[in-house]
């Protein structure tokens, strides 16, 4: 019972097709149709531009519909969609949560989205990502994982979840990993 369609945007282009289920990283911001294989980066220095794109096979709403504990009302699911980011730093997991972003119709439709960890020239307004990097660095630093001059292999997994409707008690229903990527 919803005014939102079940159809999402599907696979948008060859880059999307080649990287379904992956998070890819870049040193500058790219639109979905501008990003190319040569745009991808594997290593970063903290403080330089760090951007990412999540490529999923279906929208977050479609990934969550039908899961135990999730409403069958597509609009309610779209309203409650949020993402977690699980970072594995040298094999040690740190769970973080993205702030909610996007309109309900976007959460229902989008199969790819972009984010930024560090944008040296922010002009795009609110873009997801910097909040999970801040949390990763703070928690990793306090756990003794990060030290000046140290190098780390970091894997990021993106996981959709559905929060309970406004005013309702309960924990979010957490879905499967929909995309994963590694960088150093």
Q: At which residue positions do the language-model features occur?
A:
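Ordered hydrophobic segments in well-structured contexts
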Residues: 20-27, 49-56, 80-86, 153-159
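Residue-level detector of beta-propeller blades
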Residues: 19, 93-95, 173, 177
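Residue-level signal for secondary-structure boundary sites
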Residues: 60-62, 93, 164
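Extended, solvent-exposed segments with strong compositional bias
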Residues: 92-143
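Extended low-complexity, serine/threonine- and proline-enriched intrinsically disordered segments
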Residues: 65-113, 155-160
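Internal, hydrophobic beta-strand segments that form the core of beta-sheet-rich folds
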Residues: 79-86, 127-183
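Contiguous beta-strand segments within globular domains
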Residues: 32-85
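A eukaryote-biased signal for short, well-structured alpha-helical docking elements
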Residues: 2-28
């Amino acid at each position: 019972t919803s005014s939102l369609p079940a159809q999402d945007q599907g696979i948008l282009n060859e880059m999307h097709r080649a990287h379904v289920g992956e998070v890819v990283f870049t040193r500058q911001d790219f639109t979905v149709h501008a990003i190319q294989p040569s745009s991808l980066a594997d290593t970063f220095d903290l403080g330089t531009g760090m951007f990412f794109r999540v490529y999923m096979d279906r929208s977050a709403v479609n990934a969550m519909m039908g899961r135990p504990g999730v409403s069958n009302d597509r609009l309610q699911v779209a309203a409650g969609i949020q993402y977690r980011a699980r970072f594995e730093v040298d094999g040690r997991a740190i769970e973080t949560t993205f702030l909610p972003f996007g309109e309900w119709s976007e959460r229902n439709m989008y199969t790819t989205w972009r984010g930024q960890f560090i944008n040296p020239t922010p002009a795009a307004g609110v873009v997801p990502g910097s909040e999970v990097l801040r949390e990763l660095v703070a928690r990793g630093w306090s756990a003794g994982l990060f030290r000046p001059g140290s190098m780390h292999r970091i894997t990021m997994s993106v996981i959709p979840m559905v929060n309970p409707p406004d005013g309702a008690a309960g924990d979010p229903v957490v879905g499967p990993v929909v995309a994963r990527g590694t960088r150093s």
